[in-house]
């Protein structure tokens, strides 16, 4: 049995300080594909600092957290106690690796807050791996996924194929109405499903896969370059750049 944790954090950014107000995680038995533990915490020090919390990008979700805490689905606690409970859960379930979607971000959030609140970091003794690497290797590289993005208009602001957890989850579930909750536990749960989908496609637990950050659209256009009337290149290009009157063409992905 190989047991892993999938974590997610929600943060505010105050002068580049990544204060975390919501921590969620699920612990998975990858053999049975079952969740053996899940937790949702609201960080007391940030929650009670109303002015600070209101700077959060998803501050409008405060009523959701109130409802979750009243319904005992989330726990309000201090950062140090949250880290203590997390370490205890990891030990009890023999967690061997931690995963997150865009793990460098969540890893840095834990590092900052554990340093700020002077607590031990439960991630220090475990490998922290990026689910996006699996996704890059087994999902977003496929022509089926790219066609899904074309058909559903799933692009970034720069016109690249989207590879967000929301878009990937829509793809693996064939549910384009799905919207990511942007709360820590809910996001951990869908990211765990994405990870399991990658395992079903052949991904290996514990192996680090390269993250492909830019998913260029394969829009080929004809390109012919002549010098003194002689053709020196005839083919296609996929992207054109213009800088200070000079043209550059990207001919390969």
Predicted regions span which residues?
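Short, solvent-exposed S/T- and G/P-enriched segments that are highly enriched in secreted/extracellular
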Residues: 230-245
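Short, ordered, surface-exposed loop/turn motifs in non-cytosolic proteins
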Residues: 220-227
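Substrate-recognition/cap helix-loop segment adjacent to the acidic, metal-dependent catalytic center
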Residues: 105-129
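Active-site-proximal helix-loop-helix substrate-binding element of RNase H-like nuclease domains
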Residues: 45-67, 132-188
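A short, solvent-exposed beta-strand micro-motif common in secreted/extracellular proteins
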Residues: 247-253
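Short, polar/flexible loop-turn hinges at active-site or ligand-entry regions and domain interfaces
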Residues: 67-73, 117-124, 175-181
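Conserved non-catalytic scaffold segment of RNase H-like nuclease domains
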Residues: 2-113
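Acidic, Mg2+-coordinating catalytic module of metal-dependent nucleases/exonucleases
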Residues: 94-104, 109, 114, 151-213
């Amino acid at each position: 049995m190989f047991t892993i944790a999938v974590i997610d954090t929600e943060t505010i950014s105050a002068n580049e300080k990544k204060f975390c107000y919501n921590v969620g995680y699920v612990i998975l038995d990858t053999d049975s594909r079952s969740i053996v533990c899940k937790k949702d915490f609201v960080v007391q020090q940030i929650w009670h600092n109303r002015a600070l919390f209101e700077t959060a990008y998803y501050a409008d979700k405060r009523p959701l957290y109130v409802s979750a805490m009243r319904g005992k689905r989330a726990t309000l606690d201090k950062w140090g106690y949250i880290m203590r409970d997390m370490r205890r859960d990891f030990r009890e379930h023999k967690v061997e690796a931690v995963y997150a979607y865009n793990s460098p971000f969540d890893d840095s959030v834990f590092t900052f807050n554990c340093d700020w609140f002077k607590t031990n970091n439960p991630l220090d003794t475990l490998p922290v791996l990026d689910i996006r690497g699996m996704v890059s290797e087994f999902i977003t590289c496929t022509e089926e996924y790219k066609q899904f993005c074309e058909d559903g208009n799933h692009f970034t602001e720069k016109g690249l194929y989207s590879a967000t957890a929301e878009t990937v989850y829509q793809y693996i579930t064939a549910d384009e109405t799905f919207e990511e909750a942007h709360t820590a536990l809910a996001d951990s749960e869908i990211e765990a499903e994405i990870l399991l989908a990658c395992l079903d496609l052949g991904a290996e637990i514990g192996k680090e896969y390269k993250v492909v950050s830019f998913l260029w659209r394969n829009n080929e256009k004809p390109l012919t370059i002549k010098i003194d009337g002689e053709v020196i290149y005839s083919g296609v290009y996929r992207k054109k750049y213009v800088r200070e009157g000079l043209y550059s063409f990207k001919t390969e992905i």
